[in-house]
């Protein structure tokens, strides 16, 4: 009898849906924690995606470890791996807040009074959440990339310098390519995460442990990150300030064409390993923190 009452209380708790403002706050906090942990890998990923093969066939970085070593040695130690973190965190707050909260919002709207949500509704919710996030966060994503790459030329650009150089209009350079990356990513990620979470949840109590949430986040992140890597490469190249010997791109299609012509199709998957290594723990940690906060809200209301 007591056990049944506890189960019913747990079910009622899990049915409590936090309001949008609460999910926005939870998403922001979760994003800051997750992003700070994996930022050095994001830095290395950007460097690897941007580097070109020289005329003699040599590369500045021979993989992830080599990039870590050279940045630490030549660019101010470990601190060099955190260049762009300030602008990244400024962008992460609205990015994760909007992406996570709006995904839950659209899921709730699609689901209505039903006890389940259809797969296409999960896919659509993720895509719409991705669109909302990109419009708000593209400027900070662009600034972060410019700051991460600036050390290559010897001069390290500051946040103020990058923003002054780009101007308001320039801060939205590459928005189309960012949408091309983030909308499919969100569609894949949230649909896989939602399905896995549902299948691993105890159907009697509605409970799911944090390790299982972490597993869902890591698995969904790995798949979504791998599939969307070509779009991430194109976005990075469009948004990075070109050097004297770098090609100039007229748009997404032109960047695809020139990249494949000069470096082959493999170039579209540059940085795929660090990208997966970033996205997997980032979204795993972020979703765990996010779900903890949602659970806390439910237990106090």
Swiss-Prot record:
Residues exposed to the Mitochondrial matrix side: 45-75, 144-173, 229-271
Positions on the Mitochondrial intermembrane side per record topology: 1-23, 98-122, 195-207, 293-301
Keyword terms: Membrane, Mitochondrion, Mitochondrion inner membrane, Repeat, Transmembrane, Transmembrane helix, Transport
Localisation per UniProt entry: Mitochondrion inner membrane
Transmembrane segments: 24-44, 76-97, 123-143, 174-194, 208-228, 272-292
Primary location: mitochondrion
Membrane topology, from the record: Multi-pass membrane protein
Gene Ontology CC, one term: mitochondrial inner membrane
Function: Mitochondrial solute carriers shuttle metabolites, nucleotides, and cofactors through the mitochondrial inner membrane.
Protein name: Mitochondrial substrate carrier family protein X
């Amino acid at each position: 009898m007591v056990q049944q009452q506890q189960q019913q209380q747990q079910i009622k708790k899990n049915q409590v849906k936090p309001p949008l403002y609460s999910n926005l706050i939870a998403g922001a906090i979760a994003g800051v924690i997750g992003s700070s942990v994996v930022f050095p890998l994001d830095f290395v990923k950007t460097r690897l995606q941007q580097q070109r093969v020289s005329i003699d066939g040599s590369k500045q970085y021979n993989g992830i470890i080599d990039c870590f070593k050279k940045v630490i040695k030549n660019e101010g130690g470990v601190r060099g791996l955190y260049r762009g973190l300030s602008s990244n965190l400024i962008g992460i707050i609205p990015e994760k807040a909007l992406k996570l909260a709006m995904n839950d919002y659209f899921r709730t709207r699609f689901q209505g009074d039903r006890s389940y949500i259809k797969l296409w509704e999960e896919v659509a919710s993720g895509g719409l959440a991705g669109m909302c996030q990109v419009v708000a966060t593209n400027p900070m994503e662009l600034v972060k990339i410019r700051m991460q790459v600036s050390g290559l030329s010897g001069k390290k650009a500051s946040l103020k310098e990058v923003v002054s150089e780009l101007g308001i209009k320039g801060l939205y350079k590459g928005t189309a390519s960012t949408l091309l990356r983030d909308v499919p990513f969100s569609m894949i990620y949230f649909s896989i995460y939602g399905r896995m979470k549902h299948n691993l949840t105890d159907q009697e109590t509605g409970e799911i442990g944090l390790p299982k949430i972490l597993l869902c986040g890591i698995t969904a992140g790995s798949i979504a990150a791998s599939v969307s890597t070509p779009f991430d490469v194109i976005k990075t190249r469009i948004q990075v300030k070109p050097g004297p010997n770098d090609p100039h791109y007229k748009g997404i299609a032109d960047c695809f064409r020139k990249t494949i012509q000069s470096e082959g199709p493999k170039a579209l998957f540059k940085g795929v390993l660090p990208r997966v290594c970033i996205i997997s723990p980032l979204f795993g940690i972020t979703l765990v923190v996010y779900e903890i906060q949602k659970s806390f809200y439910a237990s106090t209301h």
